[in-house]
Amino acid sequence: MDAFSSFFDSQPGSRSWSYDSLKNFRQISPAVQNHLKRVYLTLCCALVASAFGAYLHVLWNIGGILTTIGCIGTMIWLLSCPPYEHQKRLSLLFVSAVLEGASVGPLIKVAIDVDPSILITAFVGTAIAFVCFSAAAMLARRREYLYLGGLLSSGLSMLMWLQFASSIFGGSASIFKFELYFGLLIFVGYMVVDTQEIIEKAHLGDMDYVKHSLTLFTDFVAVFVRILIIMLKNSADKEEKKKKRRN
């Protein structure tokens, strides 16, 4: 009910971006601000670890099903550890980030072979989107976007069902394109919702910055992968059009 009431309370008049909206930062207490600093610092370290994992794949071709299974297993292990095992959980986060990077490595290698600038553009684009949507979540009224969580969960379930159906029955290019853009929309939405949820949990005393960093890390990677695939597909389409013109 809180989610729906905050939604109706935030209708026209409360969503205007003005100087007053910047005052919403005052709703974030100093303790929560320090928590967010730790979350984003840990997230940056996890992204560096992930880049190292991708580099290892480029060198030794280690990415694949095993690294994906290892990444999922490490994340589950991390989430099952009690919060007081701080160092262990932090180590597990970085290990899972390295394995995630190795798992995404094959896609990154394709991008490097096609055009390295695509990889850089995709990462910068993801970083800009992440900063903008995270800032939007911080500037918004508390719990303003949390009502979207249910809609995003339903959308994610639909996306997983589509991918499962496509893997069994086969899928067309149009379905694949829909999955890409729909998935991008879903995970960009999660950037906003997860950021507000982290802030709200911190206000309630949940200062588990390792778990919160993991949440944002998975959002970042999901958006990055989809942007990279979209850019690679667009590049391939352009090359195909050029070949047709030459012929």
Curated annotation (Swiss-Prot):
Keyword tRNA processing tagged: no
Bilayer-spanning residue ranges: 58-78, 92-112, 118-138, 145-165, 173-193, 212-232
GO annotation, cellular component aspect: cytoplasm; endoplasmic reticulum; endoplasmic reticulum membrane; nuclear envelope
Keyword Acetylation: yes
Bilayer topology term: Multi-pass membrane protein
Entry keyword set: Acetylation, Apoptosis, Endoplasmic reticulum, Membrane, Transmembrane, Transmembrane helix
Residue(s) carrying N-acetylmethionine: 1
Entry's localization field: Endoplasmic reticulum membrane
Matching PROSITE patterns: BI1
Observed effect of gene inactivation: No visible phenotype under normal growth conditions. Accelerated methyl jasmonate-induced leaf senescence. Enhanced sensitivity to water stress, heat shock, toxin, tunicamycin and pathogens.
Subunit structure: Interacts (via C-terminus) with calmodulin, CYTB5-B and CYTB5-D. Interacts indirectly with FAH1 via CYTB5-D.
Similarity annotation: Belongs to the BI1 family.
Function as written in the Swiss-Prot or TrEMBL entry: Suppressor of apoptosis. Modulator of endoplasmic reticulum stress-mediated programmed cell death. Involved in methyl jasmonate-induced leaf senescence through regulating cytoplasmic calcium level.
Protein's UniProt name: Bax inhibitor 1
Source species: Arabidopsis thaliana (Mouse-ear cress)
Gene from which this protein is expressed: BI-1
